[in-house]
Amino acid sequence: MMFKLGVLLTICLLLFPLTALQLDWDQPGDHMLDISSEIDDRWFDPVRKCCMRPICMCPCCIGP
């Protein structure tokens, strides 16, 4: 009986691994909230979606 439970548990863990659960802050949309909250609203340009500071180290200003 214990062998069958072990096999069933193994199959369940292979089919539904614990790492498949969605974690907080692992999606790109979650990180955009952090970036926009760090930028001062007086310097933010909604058209460019970036700040208008003369010296800017934001990811959107550095860009590829």
UniProtKB/Swiss-Prot annotation:
The keyword Secreted applies. Keywords: Disulfide bond, Hydroxylation, Secreted, Signal, Toxin. Expressed by the venom duct. It is found in: Secreted. GO terms for molecular function: toxin activity. Its main location: secreted. Disulfide bonds join C50-C60, C51-C58, C56-C61. It comes from the Eukaryota. One of its GO terms (cellular component) is extracellular region. Residues 21-48 form a propeptide. The modification 4-hydroxyproline is found at P59. Residues 1-20 form the signal peptide. Belongs to the conotoxin M superfamily. The cysteine framework is III (CC-C-C-CC). Classified in the M-1 branch, since 1 residue stands between the fourth and the fifth cysteine residues. This is Conotoxin reg3k. It comes from Conus regius (Crown cone).
